[in-house]
C-alpha cells in the first residue's frame, strides 16, 4: 500500500526535483529551506519529488555536456542527510517516491549509470546501510496533495484514478511483475513513477480525481529549468542534467489558490537555485559578459 502526503493549508512550500545523488545541490536546497524558515517565522516546508539517488560515477575528463554541471554520486550520504534533516524538522521535510527509489523496495532495477544501479548502490552501502536506506524509502509518499490546488508526483499525471484512495491502494511491492517492463503497464504506479508526459485530457482527469488544479513534477530533464504544458502541468528541473545557471526550484504559498500553472511566476514561485549564476529570464543576477 502506498501513502499520500496531505500538505497543510498554510505556510511556504519549497519543492526540489531529481537530485540523483548530487550532495551539493541538496545542501544548497537545505540552505534555501532554512532561510525560508527564518523569513516565514518557522512556517516553511520542503518537499523532494523523488529520485534523490543513483547518480553518475564518471571522471571529469569523460563528463558529457548533456549531464550538466559536474558532480560525483553521493547517494548514500544524501539519503542519510535527508533522513537527518527530516528528523531535525519533524513534519516539515518530506520526500516522494521516485522510480529510482522504488527499485530498492520492489520496483524494477534502473540502469542509467550502471547495468544495475540498485545492486551497485546496495553493494556500496553494505547490508546495514542498505537496510537503513530501505527504511528511509519506506517513509516516502507516492504523491502529495494540497488545498492550494497543486498535486505533486515524481512523474507525469497520466495515471487513471478515480480518487486519492486509488493512490493509497497502489501496490508498491512489485510482486506481480513478470519482468521489469511490466511496470510501464502497471496501474497507477507505472505512470506516476515512469511517465515523462501526459496529455491535456489525462492531466485534467488525474487532477479532477485527486482534487487539484495543477500538477508539478520532475522525472524528465528540462535544460531551461522548467516547462509549462498547457494550463495544468509544469515540469521542473532543480538539479540533475542541468548547469547551475538553469537549476530551478518552486516556492509556493500553501494558503493561496493556484488555478493554472501560469499563476507560477518567475521570480516569485519559480526561483533559481543559484541566483548569482542564473540569467534574468529565471530571475537570476548573473552579469552578462560584455564583448570588447
Sequence positions of predicted segments:
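Conserved beta-sheet core of the metallophosphoesterase superfamily
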Residues: 111, 116-123, 197-258
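Beta-strand-turn-beta hairpins that frame and shape the catalytic cleft
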Residues: 5-14, 145-151, 231
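Active-site neighborhood of divalent metal-dependent phosphoester bond hydrolases
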Residues: 42-44, 52-151, 158
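A short C-terminal boundary segment appended to hydrolase-like catalytic domains
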Residues: 269-292
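Active-site neighborhood of phospho(di)ester-bond hydrolases with catalytic His/Asp-centered motifs
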Residues: 15-17, 46-51, 94-99, 152-153, ...
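N-terminal active-site segment of His-dependent metallophosphoesterases
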Residues: 1-73
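Active-site-proximal loop/helix segment associated with metal-binding centers of metalloenzymes
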Residues: 111-210, 243, 287, 291
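Active-site environment of divalent metal-dependent phosphoester hydrolases
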Residues: 22-24, 54-57, 100-106, 145, ...
Amino acid at each position: 500500500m502506498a501513502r499520500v502526503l496531505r500538505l497543510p493549508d498554510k505556510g511556504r512550500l519549497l519543492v526540489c526535483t531529481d537530485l540523483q545523488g548530487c550532495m551539493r545541490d541538496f545542501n544548497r536546497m537545505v540552505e534555501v529551506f532554512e532561510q525560508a524558515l527564518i523569513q516565514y517565522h518557522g512556517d516553511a516546508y520542503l518537499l523532494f519529488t523523488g529520485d534523490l539517488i543513483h547518480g553518475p560515477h564518471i571522471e571529469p575528463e569523460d563528463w558529457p555536456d548533456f549531464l550538466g554541471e559536474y558532480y560525483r554520486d553521493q547517494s548514500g550520504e544524501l539519503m542519510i542527510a535527508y533522513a537527518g534533516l527530516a528528523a531535525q524538522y519533524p513534519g516539515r521535510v518530506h520526500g516522494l517516491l521516485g522510480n529510482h527509489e522504488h527499485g530498492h523496495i520492489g520496483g524494477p532495477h534502473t540502469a542509467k549509470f550502471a547495468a544495475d544501479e540498485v545492486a551497485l548502490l546496495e553493494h556500496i552501502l553494505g547490508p546495514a546501510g542498505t537496510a537503513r536506506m530501505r527504511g528511509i524509502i519506506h517513509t516516502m509518499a507516492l504523491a502529495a496533495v494540497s488545498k492550494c490546488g497543486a498535486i505533486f508526483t515524481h512523474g507525469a499525471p497520466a495515471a487513471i484514478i478515480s480518487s486519492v484512495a486509488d493512490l493509497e491502494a497502489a501496490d508498491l511491492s512489485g510482486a506481480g511483475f513478470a519482468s521489469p517492463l511490466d511496470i510501464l503497464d502497471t496501474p497507477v504506479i507505472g505512470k506516476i513513477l515512469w511517465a515523462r508526459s501526459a496529455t491535456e485530457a489525462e492531466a485534467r482527469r488525474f487532477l479532477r480525481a485527486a482534487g487539484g488544479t495543477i500538477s508539478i513534477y520532475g522525472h524528465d530533464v528540462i535544460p531551461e529549468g522548467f516547462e509549462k504544458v498547457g494550463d495544468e502541468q509544469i515540469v521542473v528541473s532543480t538539479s540533475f542534467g542541468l548547469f547551475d545557471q538553469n537549476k530551478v526550484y518552486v516556492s509556493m504559498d500553501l494558503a493561496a489558490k493556484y488555478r493554472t500553472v501560469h499563476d507560477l511566476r518567475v521570480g516569485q514561485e519559480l526561483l533559481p537555485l543559484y541566483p548569482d549564476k542564473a540569467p534574468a529570464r529565471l530571475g537570476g543576477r548573473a552579469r552578462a559578459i560584455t564583448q570588447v
